[in-house]
Amino acid sequence: MATATPVQQRAGSRASAPATPFSPTRLSRLQEKEELRELNDRLAVYIDKVRSLETENSALQLQVTEREEVRGRELTGLKALYETELADARRALDDTARERAKLQIELGKFKAEHDQLLLNYAKKESDLSGAQIKLREYEAALNSKDAALATALGDKKSLEGDLEDLKDQIAQLEASLSAAKKQLADETLLKVDLENRCQSLTEDLEFRKNMYEEEINETRRKHETRLVEVDSGRQIEYEYKLAQALHEMREQHDAQVRLYKEELEQTYHAKLENARLSSEMNTSTVNSARGGMMESRMRIESLSSQLSNLQKDSRACLERIQELEDMLAKERDNSRRMLSDKEREMAEIRDQMQQQLNDYEQLLDVKLALDMEISAYRKLLEGEEERLKLSPSPSSRVTVSRASSSRSVRTTRGKRKRVDVEESEASSSVSISHSASATGNVCIEEIDVDGKFIRLKNTSEQDQPMGGWEMIRKIGDTSVSYKYTSRYVLKAGQTVTVWAANAGVTASPPTDLIWKNQNSWGTGEDVKVVLKNSQGEEVAQRSTVFKTTIPEEEEEEEEEPIGVPLEEERFHQQGTPRASNKSCAIM
């Protein structure tokens, strides 16, 4: 018996990686299921007819039995071989579909990571441009600081020259001061000497005065003794002359002493005034020099502090620039490494996808060969039915067409059943048509035909607030509505999937939402979903319509000659040979 992939497994894979309704693999398996069931039914009818012929033709029972045994063994071998190859092909197709879905999911994830890396790279580039702008600003500030530093150094050199000049002047003034002090000391010594001389002259004057007085007294005594001898007339004249001579001598002596004293005082006062003026001039010069030195020292100290501050700022700016350059180089290396890693991973994923596509093409070649084998098998059965005058059951074929698909893919799925009762099925064709429209930024991207989810997408470059928006699903006369919360916002370029409660998916806002009050969105032949904004205006709609038609019966193939061996054709597709040289003898 042929193996079948459970429907629940397909639904689970579709929930984990959403696929389009009636994927090519599912449609192909449905078609294979119908074909195999039709072949099994026809084979069962054929076997029943053979048995009835065996009972009716008792005379030919032994011959028919032998030929039926031979034919049964050949059919059993062909059937086992066919079922084995078909099961292998189905497993390979299932594995390929799963791997392809997994690779598509990984590809989407890597694309998202690549987009995020591009965003991070753009952000790093903007940070780099900002850092470069800041670096240029720091360089301009550093240049201005260097200019200010050069100016300060020039001022410092000029001030140092002025300081040296002031030091020379101070040295000269100090030398002048020492000379003035020495001169003052000499003048002081001279003053003391003059005072001593004046004192000695005064004492000498007093001494001489005393001597003169003694001499006068002596002379007076002598004159007094002579006066006795001189007559009285001459005594008065003599005394008068003597007094006048003494008075003149005293006045002359006093005038000489006074003149000498005045000259001495004038000389002393002049020298003292000169020394005082020289000392004051030296003191004022020294004070001004000291004031200039203090000002120069204070200015030098302020310039030194400014210079140290500028040097500190310059060192800090250089360190910051070096740090920013290191960070920038590190970020560039990290970005290049991450981009190279992602590009290598994407290249590996592309290689894996290409390998999977090649394997898928090979499996399609195998499937095409199996379809041709099934067709040859059908021709054999129809030839035997026509030869034995059996009523063939009409072929059952299912074709599904999608409005969004550009090719027709036939896949098989299902488990064959042995049918004991002859039954005929009408050939049918199922077509699915989708139509969608949108007048705003949000469109309805997908409706699950199983009623598990509805997906919306924001096609604009702006975030869309969804507060108060309503999504209405209509199937015939029934309708259900879902309202978004007042704070929900659909990001630019983002999709949101609203799952039913029984979809088996966990909520992951803001991309996956769960409608807990509704177990299913519902299924039917005519499904329509309308999206309305908070003002009740229709901004998007999407509808899915299922149509079933009955095509005309295929023309019967010509009857094959009895007992002639049939050889299957060799099929080639894309350079891959697939040949089968099996022959079957039909009696």
From Swiss-Prot:
In this UniProt entry, which residues carry a covalently attached lipid of the kind S-farnesyl cysteine?
Answer: 584
Amino acid composition bias (Low complexity), ranges on this chain: 390-409
List, for all copies, the residue spans of the domain called IF rod: 32-388
Query: Acidic residues compositional bias: what residue ranges?
Result: 551-561
Q: Which Pfam families match?
A: Filament (PF00038), LTD (PF00932)
Q: Quick one: where's region Tail?
A: 387-587
- Phosphothreonine PTM sites in chain numbering: 3, 5, 20, 25, 576
Q: Where is this region: Head?
A: 2-34
Main localization is nucleus
Q: Where is this cross-link: Glycyl lysine isopeptide (Lys-Gly) (interchain with G-Cter in SUMO2)?
A: 102, 123, 145, 157, 181, 241, 261, 271, 312, 330, 532, 547
Give the glycosylated residues.
399
Cysteine methyl ester: residues bearing it: 584
Residues annotated with N-acetylalanine modification: 2
Q: Does the keyword Thylakoid apply?
A: no
Q: Which residues carry this modification: N6-acetyllysine?
A: 111, 157, 271, 330, 483
Q: Which residues carry this modification: Omega-N-methylarginine?
A: 14, 413
Q: According to the UniProt entry, which residues carry Phosphoserine?
A: 16, 23, 28, 126, 158, 200, 232, 278, 302, 375, 393, 534
Subunit architecture: Homodimer. Lamin dimers then assemble into dimeric head-to-tail polymers. Ultimately, two head-to-tail polymers assemble laterally into a protofilament with a uniformly shaped rod of 3.5 nm in diameter. Interacts with SPAG4 and SEPT12.
Task of the protein: Lamins are intermediate filament proteins that assemble into a filamentous meshwork, and which constitute the major components of the nuclear lamina, a fibrous layer on the nucleoplasmic side of the inner nuclear membrane. Lamins provide a framework for the nuclear envelope, bridging the nuclear envelope and chromatin, thereby playing an important role in nuclear assembly, chromatin organization, nuclear membrane and telomere dynamics.
Report the family membership: Belongs to the intermediate filament family.
Provide the protein name. Lamin-B1
Which gene is this protein's source?
Answer: Lmnb1
